[in-house]
Amino acid sequence: MALWDDQTKGERVTLMLGDGNPLMLTAMSEIFEKDRRFSLVATAATAEGFLGMVMRMPVQVGVIDWNLPALGGARLIDVLRAQPNAPRLVVYAEDTGDIPRKAMAAGAAGFVSRSESVERFLETCLAVAKGQMVFT
């Protein structure tokens, strides 16, 4: 918790979630809503929905499933990179193959495997909000 206290001085990190699985989206929403370090602004079930919302309601961090329906993670990151107020993105997915490398190459600021602990996931989001790149 020192990362939050020392570097953000108590300001909440604004965040948006994107996942096509309603169960995952609900579970992740609850995790972020219960953590006072974050302010969950919106959720989206598709890449297009995420893009539309993040353009209307800028946030510091976007957390997306690599396999977000329609555009997918790589294309969504590519589109967002061209936007002046785009959030820093954390991608999460199964840690198989070269997804972490692909996420980094696409321009994501972080990657978290679905097998990581909740606390590690949250700490990655905090670090990314502070400008760090984290690929676990």
Segment roles from a protein language model:
Residues T43-V61:
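Acidic, metal-coordinating helix/loop segments flanking the phosphotransfer/catalytic sites
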Residues A74-N85:
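Short amphipathic alpha-helix used as the core "switch/output" element in two-component signaling
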Residues I64-N67:
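Active-site residues of response regulator receiver
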Residues T46, G72-R75:
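Acidic catalytic/metal-coordinating carboxylates
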Residues M1-T14, M24:
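Non-catalytic signal-transmission and effector/linker regions of two-component phosphorelay proteins
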Residues D98, E116-A129, M133:
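C-terminal output helix
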